[in-house]
Regions:
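Surface-exposed loop/interface segments of Gram-negative outer-membrane beta-barrel transport/assembly proteins
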Residues: 17, 33, 147-206, 246-251, ...
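Short, small/polar-rich motifs associated with maturation and membrane association
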Residues: 1-259, 264-275, 279, 288, ...
Length: 463
């Protein structure tokens, strides 16, 4: 029965949420109730870090309205693309990542993240100028050293990933029937290569090529952190290791990283801090973002189901049809022209992969002066980045039936990159009665240099 008793519901403002402080960049803070720009805030990062994902970008999936995460292929080195309310910026349509106030600084581990703020529109991102544009900005704050008894924590994640909603190519029997109907509808005779009476090889399914190139991939993440702190100084040291197998065979990405954060309060006005990051990444990959005709995924669609991964005669990679001399003698041909110039996708992944190794060192030293005048704060920050990079790509001779390439080549390159950035920021934020006043003045200078060596060799005598 419906109750006749009247109920009165009163909604009240949550002043705690309205008074929440939001970091907008360059150390500028504002209360949430004073925001006029579109900003998304994620503070439950510990829960998100436990999600079965392998990148910080994927961790944001479904967490904020207007933020879309797009992942491509099964390559573990492919970084998911973040689209914030559309695209368009001088930074290649990608959003700008700012970690602890430093644009482009690395994130060593998802477990090291304290909070994430996404600046969604051009107005809020304009503080970073042409680096971001309309693409937006993602501000990441990492966990800092805290006062208290020494603590040692460990976080570990294990899991498996599989590619889903894969294209289902036709089997051999369906391919033959499709060809028969297409030639019949065109009023043309069926070529001998698609006639199972004259070429029985084409009518038997031997390989599911999608199953051949994709796998159940294992990933693991480990993070161990030590925190030691007093009321005057504190330090936090974390070590992380990530190992991500790609869902495409013979692809992987491994990260080993060390992050140190230390802070010392010299007196009631002056605080100095140091952030040091070392990150080493090795990977083996295959380009899938722009999967051309000879890319592994499209090749798995084009490759005939009657073909084999390996040649049963000698164990070499199989082509579009048989190379058995006895078969060719019996039927007069192997009818290679029936399948065009398709490429064995397993060979593309096993023999032609890219190898990358990157070593990064980031050092950020900060000086903060505050409490001299109410609401006034000065921060001077100097960041140095040293990166060493190595890349190797080898394309062997491809002589199997299909689309041969009788010329091999190898490409190697390495470079060293040095960069520094200095920022000096003066901020003022104070409240007078019902009025809040905020101001920011900042100067930035940066330097970037890169030196490298690249070598390409063709038609090598041995592989």
């Amino acid at each position: 029965p419906v109750s006749e008793k009247q109920m009165t519901i009163v909604l009240k403002e949550d002043t705690e949420l309205l008074d929440e402080v939001v970091v907008l960049g360059y150390g500028a803070n504002t209360r949430k109730q004073d925001l006029s720009a579109s900003v998304g805030i994620i503070s439950n990062t510990d829960e998100l870090a436990a999600r079965p994902v392998t990148s910080t970008e994927s961790m944001l999936q479904g967490q904020l309205p207007g933020v879309t995460i797009q992942a491509d292929g099964g390559d573990p080195t492919s970084t998911p693309n973040i689209v914030i309310r559309g695209q368009g910026s001088q930074n290649g349509d990608n959003v700008l990542w700012v970690v602890d106030g430093v644009p482009g600084a690395p994130i060593t581990s998802m477990n090291d993240i304290e909070s994430i703020v996404v600046l969604k529109d051009a107005a809020s991102a304009a503080i970073y100028g042409a680096q971001s544009g309309a693409g937006g900005v993602v501000l990441v704050t990492t966990k800092k050293a805290k006062e208290g008894a020494p603590t040692l924590t460990y976080d570990g994640t294990f899991g498996f990933r599989q590619a889903t909603n894969l294209i289902e190519p036709l089997n051999a029997e369906e391919q033959v029937e499709m060809r028969r109907r297409s030639y019949e509808n065109a009023g043309q005779a069926l070529p001998d290569g698609w006639n199972v009476t004259k070429n029985p090889w084409v009518g038997t399914t031997r390989t599911d090529w999608m199953d051949a190139i994709f796998r159940t991939a294992f990933y693991q993440r480990h993070n161990i952190a030590l925190n030691v702190g007093t009321d005057k100084s504190s330090s936090r040291l974390s070590l992380s290791f990530d190992n991500d197998q790609g869902t495409l065979i013979n692809t992987y990405k491994k990260n080993l990283a060390l992050r140190y954060n230390g802070k010392m309060q010299l007196n009631k006005w002056i605080t100095i801090s140091e952030d040091l990051v070392w990150k080493n990444t090795t990977s083996r990959s295959k380009e899938t973002d722009n999967d051309a005709y000879t890319g592994p995924i499209l090749s798995a669609v084009y490759m005939p189901a009657s073909a084999t991964i390996y040649n049963p005669l000698d164990g070499s990679y199989g082509g579009t049809t048989t190379e058995d001399p006895a078969y060719i003698e019996k039927y007069g041909s192997n009818f290679a022209d029936a399948h065009g110039d398709a490429v064995n996708p397993v060979r593309l992944l096993e023999a032609e992969n890219l190898y990358n190794k990157t070593s990064d060192v980031w050092s950020t030293t900060s000086l903060e002066i505050g409490n001299v005048l109410p609401g006034l704060k000065f921060v001077s920050r100097f960041t140095y980045n040293l990166q060493n990079y190595y890349y190797k790509k080898f394309n062997p001779i491809r002589d199997e039936v299909g689309k041969p390439n009788l010329s091999n080549n190898v490409q190697e390159q390495s470079y060293r990159m040095d960069a520094w950035k200095t920022e000096n920021t003066l901020t003022y934020d104070n409240t007078f009665g019902k009025h809040t006043v905020g101001a920011l003045f900042s100067t930035t200078a940066d330097h970037y240099s890169k030196r490298g060596l690249e070598a390409i060799g063709k038609d090598l005598s041995s592989e």
